[in-house]
């Protein structure tokens, strides 16, 4: 079969339309996962009784199992539970009304939360303990020290890891095609199925992922420069 160069362009035009959905499934899990990670960090730092073990189990489970399983567990497990809740409380709605992409975002948010917990924790461990001691010496409480010194510095140190995770999640969105979410890779498969030009379609998809990754890497450089103002904490 002859290689079809023009089809790469036409396939990319269709895939470009799915970039907003793809980015949403990559960015929102990082945002929600960051909130989950902050909760985990607070639980561990303040050693909240009964929750430390739960936090460790959560992080261990989601870092030790593949994201595709998380998606399938949420995609297959949440709808029956949601329907039961709706029926019990007479809410009058069905899980079928929930966009499939929302299940993907839920699953990847839990995945991101586990990884971000370890990223932020490693950033905290990398801190100079002298800064914490200095904060205590001027009368800051532990919670104030955490909010104004520890967390800003840990986030600054962790920016490259955040970017790497974001790039990884951008690529991970490709597995959403398994539950029929039309993101970049899923759309490439669909547009290629008419004339079996799968090679051309996937080359187009690779170009789009490459460009998006370059943009994220550039954004990382900007963030690192802006975050330099947090050097030394925010006392």
Curated annotation (Swiss-Prot):
- One GO cellular component, as annotated: ATP-binding cassette (ABC) transporter complex
Q: Name one GO biological process term.
A: amino acid transport
Q: How does it sit in the membrane?
A: Multi-pass membrane protein
**Span of domain ABC transmembrane type-1:** 15-220
Q: Where in the cell is it found?
A: Cell membrane
The family database entries (CDD domains) matched by this protein are listed as: TM_PBP2
Which InterPro entries does UniProt cross-reference here? AA_ABC_transptr_permease_3TM (IPR010065), ArtM/GltK/GlnP/TcyL/YhdX-like (IPR043429), MetI-like (IPR000515), MetI-like_sf (IPR035906)
Q: Which UniProt keywords apply?
A: Amino-acid transport, Cell membrane, Membrane, Transmembrane, Transmembrane helix, Transport
Q: What induces it?
A: More strongly expressed in the presence of methionine than in the presence of sulfate.
**GO molecular function list:** transmembrane transporter activity
Family under the similarity heading: Belongs to the binding-protein-dependent transport system permease family.
Q: What is the protein name stated in its UniProt record? A: L-cystine transport system permease protein TcyM
Please name the source species. Bacillus subtilis (strain 168)
Function noted in UniProt: Part of the ABC transporter complex TcyJKLMN involved in L-cystine import. Probably responsible for the translocation of the substrate across the membrane. Is also involved in cystathionine, djenkolate, and S-methylcysteine transport.
NCBIfam families in the record = HEQRo_perm_3TM
Among PANTHER family, the record links this protein to:
L-CYSTINE TRANSPORT SYSTEM PERMEASE PROTEIN TCYM (PTHR30614:SF43), MEMBRANE COMPONENT OF AMINO ACID ABC TRANSPORTER (PTHR30614)
Q: Which residues cross the membrane?
A: 23-43, 59-78, 100-120, 165-185, 196-216
Coiled-coil stretches are none
The answer, when asked if Zinc-finger is one of the entry's keywords, is no
Q: How does it assemble?
A: The complex is composed of two ATP-binding proteins (TcyN), two transmembrane proteins (TcyL and TcyM) and two solute-binding proteins (TcyJ and TcyK).
**A Pfam family of this chain:** BPD_transp_1
């Amino acid at each position: 079969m002859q290689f079809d160069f023009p089809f790469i362009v036409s396939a990319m035009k269709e895939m470009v339309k799915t970039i907003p959905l793809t980015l949403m499934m990559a960015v929102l899990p990082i945002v929600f996962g960051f909130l989950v990670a902050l909760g985990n960090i607070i639980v561990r730092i303040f050693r909240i009784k009964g929750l430390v073990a739960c936090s460790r189990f959560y992080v261990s489970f989601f870092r030790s199992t593949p994201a595709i399983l998380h998606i399938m567990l949420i995609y297959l497990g949440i709808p029956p539970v949601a329907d039961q809740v709706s029926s019990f409380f007479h809410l009058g709605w069905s899980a079928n009304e929930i966009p499939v992409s929302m299940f993907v975002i839920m699953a990847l948010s839990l995945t991101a939360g586990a990884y971000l917990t370890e990223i932020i924790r490693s950033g905290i461990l990398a801190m100079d303990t002298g800064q914490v001691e200095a904060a205590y010496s001027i009368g800051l409480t532990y919670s104030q020290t955490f909010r104004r010194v520890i967390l800003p510095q840990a986030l600054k140190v962790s920016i490259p890891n955040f970017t790497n995770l974001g790039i990884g999640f951008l690529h991970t969105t490709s597995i959403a095609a398994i539950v029929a979410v039309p993101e970049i890779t899923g759309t490439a498969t669909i547009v290629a199925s008419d004339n079996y030009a799968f090679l051309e379609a996937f080359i187009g998809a690779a170009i789009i992922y490459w460009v998006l990754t370059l943009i994220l890497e550039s954004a990382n450089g900007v963030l690192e420069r802006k975050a330099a103002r947090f050097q030394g904490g925010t006392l």
